[in-house]
Amino acid sequence: GQGGLAGWQWMFLLQGVPTVLLGGLAIYLLSDSFANAKWLGAHERAVLEADHRLDAASKPASSTDSLLAVFKNPAIWAFGLIYFCIQSGVYAINFWLPSIIKNLGFSDTLVIGWISAIPYLLAAVFMLLVGRSADLHKERRWHLVVPMLMGALGLVIAVNFATQPAIAILGLTIATMGALTGLPMFWPVPTAMLSAGAAAGGLALINSMGHMAGFLSPYLVGLVN
């Protein structure tokens, strides 16, 4: 460490200070509407405003968009639980994948690193393919459900074939592909179903519930391990 601060404290400062400064600048640099965006041309602005009106018209109308109404909305809590489950799988894999692979019988650090990279490489390809398919077919729900089922199935395979490294790694790969793809495929679903007024508080609550998994999931996996 330097200057009386430990290395991890410097890391927090170096990562946090630019973020806070950028957040302050965003107030002045970002426009609050299409009409005020100076970097958009007149035609681009008109197209975006038309799309925005169509999007708003397709969402359910609501006269109860208060914060209290958000907390009373069962759909928001259901979405929060779904997102919590997705994030639980993601955090568990991100934190524990190398350790799990080591417990399968691999001792060389380099080999563990290469094997750990396989699920993420395939997940990156799968994520692009699923996203492309969702846009092509204009469908979101099943493009979310299938990756989530893959994530659950992959973990079940990995657990039940822990004594067979090849099959266990296959299960972990399927789980990683499903969990990481579920993240980007999740958000269009609640965004499309919530009214404009409910979306702000609703999405914030869903996001907060999901990221509680970042605290709980690694501890739970470690406890089970």
What spans do the regions from the language model cover?
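Extracytoplasmic gate region of multi-pass secondary transporters
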Residues: 66-131, 183, 187, 214-218
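C-terminal transmembrane helical hairpin of 12-TM major facilitator-type secondary transporters
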Residues: 136-189
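Helix-to-loop junctions at the C-terminal end of transmembrane segments
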Residues: 125-139, 225
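A late C-terminal transmembrane helix in Major Facilitator Superfamily
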Residues: 191-225
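Cytoplasmic loop-to-transmembrane helix junctions
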Residues: 7, 111, 139, 198-205
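Central mid-sequence intracellular linker of multi-pass
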Residues: 5-67
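Small-residue (Gly/Pro/Ala) motifs that create kinks and tight helix-helix packing interfaces
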Residues: 1, 22, 26, 98, ...
